[in-house]
Amino acid sequence: MMPEATRSAAGGRPYWNGTAVRSRLFDALSLLLPAGEAFLIETLQAWRAQASTPHDDALHDEIDRFIREEGAHQRAHARYNAALIAGLPGAEAVARRAERVAAGLADLGLPMQVALAAAFEQLTALVSREIVEHDTLLVDDGSQPSRLWRWHAREELDHCDVALAVAARGAPSRWLRRLALVLATGYLASDLVRYTWALCRCDIAAGASRRALLADGIRVMVGSLPALARMARGWLGFAVSPQGRPHGQA
């Protein structure tokens, strides 16, 4: 018999990422992404429109590519989220909260927005390298969600330097970028925990066992320690050298 923590409360279907909490963690991240991708796109567009530095054709082309790829990610996750919400209606409130938080970032000055865009990209790249190189966080079973995340991760690793290049020009203060990294980390970590728990509560309301989900959460936390250690090393590398590539690329 399939363990309870690997079966969805909705019809007993298996959770796509092996267990309940790992699946809901990535579902929560997906609900955050469309609003986050929109912030990244709008920030780079605003910086390019206002940039007073000499025109850089290569960077201009890279920003165009960044915007195209982030737009594709945004649309793909919006479709995934629509299917998630259809099966788990409580997830819609999570997506709306994420949109409100992202909209609040528009009130910040452009240098801080640029610094935050670079910080979010670097954090996403740290997660992406874990997805591409290890199977601690994401199962590699050929499922549609797994393929979606691996495609997204590969493109993030390929274009994260664009946001860093823009930050080097639009937010040249290293201390501002370090502050942005701390703020982005706190925002992302706290929201992932809150939204993952919100989705798990939806599962509990649909009949899942609270005790089984708690036990699964503990197992996931313990099993994720190697991944968290690798990402922490990358995070520290970025804090020391904000323009660097601590996620391991050459």
Task: Show the residue positions of the predicted features.
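Non-heme di-metal
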Residues: 1-250
